[in-house]
């Protein structure tokens, strides 16, 4: 199935690409008229709903027996409060979280969930990670007190972004590519550079 959101109605829908008549509402969202980006976990067991206009990330679990998604529940950030703070759950502050991807973390081998979620935090000019336990950590950017800019260097103490949006992982090259929107460049970091 292909999943999509309806902005004005605040709903998640899905359609069977081989049978467009099979188009159905999956679940309602906590807010109508707010932008939402969906990123599915590699297992297909759940997806993150990035509510970038509300500065939060929510989660909806998928039940393979019923084929239904659960009502989205809160993971991190505070509704309609934009700021910056690493931490867990409601103590985290985000500012327009944007795109993201899941990346297997070797240190989680044998755990129920072996993936960290990397995402661009547009208004905070940085890239952050969300662990399976809900801990958010700034991965890159925010050098010089979180100011925007364009600078290469060590990920946390030197690198600067200017409203990053797109982010993707290239498994072949073991590299993360970040669409640094206002700088109008695509930036690259490798896992060897991680702090």
Locate the predicted segments by residue.
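Residue position within the beta-strands of beta-propeller blades
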Residues: 4-5, 48-50, 119-120, 178-180
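Hydrophobic/aromatic beta-strand positions that recur at structurally equivalent sites within the blades
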Residues: 5, 13-18, 59-62, 129-130, ...
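A short loop-to-beta-strand structural motif that recurs across blades of beta-propeller domains
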Residues: 10-13, 55-58, 125-129, 135, ...
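Gly/Pro-rich loop segments of beta-rich domains
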Residues: 18-36, 67-99, 134-165, 195
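Residue-level detector of Asp-centered blade-edge/turn motifs that repeat once per structural unit
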Residues: 40-44, 102-114, 169-173
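Blade-level signature of beta-propeller repeat domains, shared across WD40, Kelch, NHL, RCC1
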Residues: 163-195
